[in-house]
């Protein structure tokens, strides 16, 4: 049965209410609160039962047949929400907005929040070291405006991107946006690629939020930025019912201030996840992340995503790392303090979004507790950080919140004794009543002589005295007992005194829970008032944690401070790939990388498996680490500031489905060639291998020439086309280097050492031997190789002989005749005759 097929007039009042609410949330799965359960009906129920593996049942709704229904307990709803959201569904949470006990008739209900991939705020749903961004894209036909926010931290950004869909897509993937809001004029190809290739949630919306949250963008005047901001705000506030009071300001991201890296570069260099397993382990961020807080981990990732171009700011980070390296005891003491700091950024979001519980408040309090200690130590380091101690708020939380509060807010035991006089009095009443009831059982046993008498309690009948069937005869009417319930083996009684004490206890219990809840809301309001100050402190703590992490990494991995220069030189002595070195079981071989102002390109030849790709990645990683403000893995490093890095290393994912490997290779190469400047870095690994040999070699040579002649940026170009090594004779800015290997008695040892000059062997058959290819196959490969090498030598000799005896006589006659011709003074017939004469001369 489908929702749109039923006659609404026949539905029960509750189901009519459901239908009215569901009409406003057609795209969402509606969790409809009924008592202790969330229930799902019609298509939502069928879908949820399948996705969540729930039993699909039916519910009486006033119709002749039962409607499809399934449900989940309200107290354990989070795992179900997480499962649906991770599968790309949006969920609307409909709550009871009134207390059923105090309401006559239908309980008022309404949707209080919409949960989707991009707007999660519950910490247990989120990866602590990742931001959870939702974005908006507006297409202005000359440029894109990308606006993105992390509701869980209160970060909100806007930036302008060139009108290039690949660059837009690359930015969306780099930010790992979970949802994208697009206007209705958006390109359908972009929509399909985002949704189908990358599983990003897409919503089409062309509405803009006016006259709300203006304070967060009051200083922004650009009409394009404002449109992007209002577009995203409309979705968050109107569609998803988010309270964004924890967002202080929208930050404009100026892309030109940062080193640019497209999605291919970030993936090829394995900055955040490995190429093969798509895991964080063994990526660069895994190596560098020595942070103690979730906020610091996210900040470090942001620095790695956005390496700087301003030398002064970069050197400032170097100075802080040096200071920390010289103050080991202070650094370790701060790290111990940071370990006690919880995720203040996301806790602030929970304050605003209404999902804060007492344990969250306790985490805020425990975080604030260590701030004075951190502040004192930071002062001794002379770091310019704006960390407040929040002493007043800490004292309030220390006095108010119990050390072991319950998970939910309606269980009581939230507030400490001594915080509120009325609460203490109610607790005393409750305690006295419970104490009376606990002693009543003993006194009644003694008074009546009924040894198996007991005092019990249940929700329906309250407190009662229970007597077994065999002792009923001993009950005296003078005791004033009133029969309340008959069971198979016993009778239950109440007394006036018992009911009086019960009313006292239960009334006090109810008042205690209500008062504690209201006191907790007051505490939450006190936190709310300091929300922006807390967010500032959280941001400063994250910076401190991140820079300390880089200091720890510099000592653990023997990193050095690089020297940044305005000269166009790269001078790295004994450089290392930090991740490969860390996981390598053998001794890592370091290598120099030297390119003076007259050398733009290193043309790298050498055997397979010798380390060419690692050497290339190593340079890029050293540059990225240097520009994010980190020390680098080398004995010494002098580096310029780069504006962009482009890589084509190995197989890469296709942004637009359906392209061949070679086409993807060419598209990536074109991206580098078109967008690189003289201050960029290009890494091309065996370009041209995806097509026929001569085609590939021709393209590789043409690209190499183009870079050397037109772009003149620092480039590492590895190749197995040994014919290209002669280009250093044609272009003085190309230098040949090779990865050395030792050949002894038919065995090859890869030395992994970069040396000057070129080599003309790739040792492919040796690599096949290492791969345990069959001996018969290897023997045949050797035979074929010898034939090819022999033919190659003959061809070279033939070419040499041919070149020694050219006939230049006719050429010179032709040249002489051509010199005499005046094309503009010839008739068409004369021109044809002259062409015929030249052709005959050429035949001779």
Predicted feature descriptions by range:
Residues 42-43, 222, 226, 292, ...:
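ATPase nucleotide-binding head domains, primarily ABC-like/P-loop NTPase cores
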Residues 94, 117-126, 243, 379-382, ...:
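Active-site phosphate-binding and catalytic loops of NTP-dependent enzymes
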Residues 487-525:
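Extended, charged coiled-coil "arm/hinge" scaffolds of SMC/Rad50-like chromosome-maintenance ATPases
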């Amino acid at each position: 049965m489908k929702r749109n097929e039923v006659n609404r007039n026949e539905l029960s009042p509750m189901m009519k209410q459901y239908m009215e609410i569901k009409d406003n949330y057609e795209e969402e799965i509606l969790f409809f609160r009924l008592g202790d359960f969330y229930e799902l009906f019609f298509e939502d129920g069928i879908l949820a039962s399948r996705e969540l593996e729930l039993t699909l049942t039916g519910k009486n709704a006033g119709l002749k047949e039962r409607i499809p229904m399934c449900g989940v307990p309200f107290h354990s709803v989070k795992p179900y929400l997480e499962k649906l959201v991770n599968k790309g569904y949006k969920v609307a949470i409909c709550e009871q907005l009134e207390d059923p006990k105090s309401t006559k008739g239908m309980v008022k209900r309404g949707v209080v929040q919409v949960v989707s991939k991009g707007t999660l705020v519950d910490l247990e749903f989120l990866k602590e070291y990742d931001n959870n961004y939702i974005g908006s894209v507006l297409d202005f036909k000359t440029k894109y405006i990308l606006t993105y926010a992390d509701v869980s931290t209160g970060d909100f950004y806007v930036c302008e991107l060139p009108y290039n869909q690949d660059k837009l897509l690359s930015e969306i993937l780099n930010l790992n946006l979970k949802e994208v809001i697009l206007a209705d004029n958006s390109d359908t190809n972009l929509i399909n690629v985002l949704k189908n290739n990358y599983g990003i949630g897409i919503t089409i919306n062309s509405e803009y939020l006016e006259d709300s949250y203006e304070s967060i963008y009051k200083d922004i005047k650009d009409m394009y930025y404002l449109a992007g901001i209002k577009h995203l705000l409309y979705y968050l506030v109107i569609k998803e019912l988010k309270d964004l009071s924890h967002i202080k300001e929208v930050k404009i991201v100026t892309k030109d201030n940062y080193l640019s890296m497209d999605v291919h570069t970030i993936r090829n260099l394995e900055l955040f996840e490995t190429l093969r397993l798509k895991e964080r382990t063994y990526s660069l961020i895994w190596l560098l992340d020595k942070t103690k807080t979730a906020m610091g981990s996210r900040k470090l990732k942001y620095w790695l995503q956005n390496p700087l171009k301003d030398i002064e700011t970069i050197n400032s980070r170097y100075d802080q790392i040096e200071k920390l390296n010289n103050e080991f005891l202070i650094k370790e003491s701060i790290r111990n303090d940071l370990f006690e700091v919880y995720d203040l950024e996301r806790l602030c979001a929970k304050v605003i979004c209404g999902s804060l519980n007492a344990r969250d408040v306790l985490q805020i309090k425990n975080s604030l507790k260590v701030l004075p200690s951190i502040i004192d130590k930071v002062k001794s380091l002379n770091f310019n950080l704006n960390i407040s101690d929040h002493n007043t708020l800490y004292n309030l939380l220390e006095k108010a919140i119990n050390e072991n509060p319950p998970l939910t807010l309606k269980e009581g035991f939230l507030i400490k004794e001594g915080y509120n006089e009325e609460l203490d009095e109610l607790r005393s009443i409750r305690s006295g009543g419970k104490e009376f009831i606990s002693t009543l059982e003993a006194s009644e046993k003694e008074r009546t002589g009924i040894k198996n008498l007991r005092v019990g309690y249940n929700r329906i009948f309250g407190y009662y005295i229970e007597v077994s069937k065999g002792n009923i005869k001993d009950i005296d009417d003078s005791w004033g007992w009133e029969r309340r319930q008959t069971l198979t083996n016993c009778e239950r009684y109440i007394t006036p005194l018992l009911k009086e004490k019960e009313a006292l206890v239960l009334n006090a219990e109810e008042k205690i829970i209500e008062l504690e809840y209201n006191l907790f809301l007051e505490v939450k309001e006190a936190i709310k008032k300091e929300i922006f100050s807390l967010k500032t402190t959280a941001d400063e703590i994250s910076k401190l944690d991140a820079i300390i992490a880089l200091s720890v990494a510099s000592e653990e991995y023997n990193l050095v401070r690089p020297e940044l220069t305005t000269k166009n030189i790269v001078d790295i002595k004994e450089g290392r790939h930090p991740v490969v070195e860390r996981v390598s079981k053998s001794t890592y071989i370091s290598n120099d990388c030297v390119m003076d102002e007259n050398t733009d390109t290193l043309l790298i030849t050498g055997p397979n498996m010798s380390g060419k790709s690692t050497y290339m990645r190593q340079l890029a990683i050293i540059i990225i680490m240097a520009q994010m403000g980190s020390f680098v893995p080398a004995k010494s490093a002098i580096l310029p500031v780069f504006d962009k890095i482009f890589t084509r290393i190995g197989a890469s994912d296709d942004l637009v489905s359906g392209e061949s490997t070679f086409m993807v290779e060419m598209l990536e190469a074109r991206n580098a060639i078109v967008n690189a400047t003289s201050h960029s870095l290009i890494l091309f690994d065996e370009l041209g291998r995806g097509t026929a040999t001569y085609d590939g070699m021709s393209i590789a040579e043409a690209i190499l020439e183009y870079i050397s002649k037109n772009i003149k940026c620092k480039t590492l170009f590895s190749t197995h086309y040994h014919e290209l090594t002669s280009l250093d004779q044609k272009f003085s800015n190309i230098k040949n280097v090779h990865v050395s290997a030792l050949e002894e008695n038919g065995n090859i040892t890869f030395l992994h050492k970069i040396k000057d000059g070129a080599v003309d062997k790739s040792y492919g058959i040796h690599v096949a031997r290492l791969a345990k290819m069959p001996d018969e196959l290897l023997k045949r490969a050797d035979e074929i190789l010898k034939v090819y090498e022999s033919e190659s030598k003959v061809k070279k000799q033939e070419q040499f002989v041919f070149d020694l005896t050219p006939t230049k006589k006719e050429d010179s006659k032709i040249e002489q005749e051509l010199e005499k011709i005046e094309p503009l003074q010839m008739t068409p017939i004369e021109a044809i005759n002259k062409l015929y004469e030249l052709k005959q001369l050429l035949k001779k």
